[in-house]
Amino acid sequence: MTHNAVQTSVADTVPPFDPETFWTLFHHATVAVNGVRLHFVEGGSGAPILLIPGWPQSWYTWRYVMPLLAAAGRRVIALDPRGMGDSDRPASGYEMRTAAADLHGFVEALGLTVNGPLDVVGHDVGTWIGYAYAAEWPEDVKRLAVFDAGIPGITPPAPAGIPSTEANVKTWHFAFNRLDDLPEILLQGREREFLTWLFRTKAVRPWTITPADLDEYVRVNAAPGATRAALSYYRHKLGPEGLAHSHARAERKLAMPVLAFGAETGVGAMLVDTMRLVATDVDGGVFEGCGHYMPEEAPRAVAEQIMRFMSA
């Protein structure tokens, strides 16, 4: 299969986050959807584009990309899905059907599809949610862009046996996160140490996540119930019901255009190959010289590829 290679470098980074400048362009807001309060950050004007983060992050993962998209003439909305960031952390509702319904309710509450379907972008677990949303509510989604994730139940599983050191570093958390109780026992109170290790290990340019950025991620991950809530996505997605829903969803191929890029030291070409199993119109490939945290490690390249795709 054909894969596009996008070479990334330090030139694709931006200066460290400047709150004073950022908050002149964007603002916090919340909306009640499906019985939960969802937090989001938005700004800019034009056709809306919805950004969905992954684990263990929040809307904040998009902070470098958002001004670039707004400058390109888009209304940019970065959402904290239930259980993430500053959204509510209920005891249930972390299966993909509910996550997709949350997005549909959120989009309706904000009137984002009044003028037609909107563009949706996901990273990591945000890719799971964005794909499920596009599959469950295809009339809502004009185009879907996804970054660095495998999709359990659709992405072919790794060969059985002891994984290589490289593979283990990339995938160990799938088995760990789905365990009941143990992750909470080990992680609560040690969020800073854990996140420091995670960002250092999975990033090619870990310095793009500054000490101030780490403080923000520690804040949302150390909040009461945050670890359990975020890991509930893995527990549902990797369980029998979640996998069955993935298989059923894959039988209805997406008709809207899809952009899929993995990171060279992340999932690589696996994501675009995965999306070609579930969609009929797929573009994408690999960000070379980039780690898993693509919106932070190469925000200029991420924004450029999004706008290229969504301007076609």
Predicted regions: what they are:
Residues 2-41, 48, 77, 84-121, ...:
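Flexible "cap/lid" subdomain of the alpha/beta-hydrolase fold that forms the substrate-access gate
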Residues 58-59, 128, 290-291:
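A short, glycine- and basic residue-enriched loop/turn
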Residues 290-303:
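Catalytic histidine-centered segment of alpha/beta-hydrolase-like enzymes
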